[in-house]
Amino acid sequence: MKTQLDSLTAFFMQNVPERAGRGFDSQIDGMKVISAARDVGNGQYRLSVLRYTALLSWERFPFRLVDPQLLVALLEVWMDEHAAPVLEETGIENTEADWDVTLEDEETATVVLSIPLADELVIRPDAKGLIPYRGERWSLVEPEIWTALSATVYGVDESGAPVGES
């Protein structure tokens, strides 16, 4: 299963210049399990939401060669495009990042980013699954969400009104 931290880590690794990314590391610091059970469709069931603080660090970041604002911009872009909607759904509002920068010498610094992230803990029936639940075997899965692109809404008569793409 790919986590939000996995996604953010891969994004930074793909977009930060190689020299600046040599001392890069990412890990989870602290985790809270939020009860948020519900049927999410397609035979899937969400047990809970895992909220944690992601720590990403760059040792010996060459701030004179690579503008440190690149890291901030990349985080903002990733948050806008990839951050889990489960944060809003479960009422998690404080998603502000904390940046800690320590100068090492005239050309490098250690940069540490801490940011709250969340992942859904979703299971699906699977005869070979490792999780016994409600008389069945289940496996952990990445949530699969289907989005309707069009529909027809019926009111009081048989003439429907199309919605979305046709």
Question: PLM features: residue spans?
Answer:
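Short, charged interaction patches at domain edges and termini
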Residues: 99-166
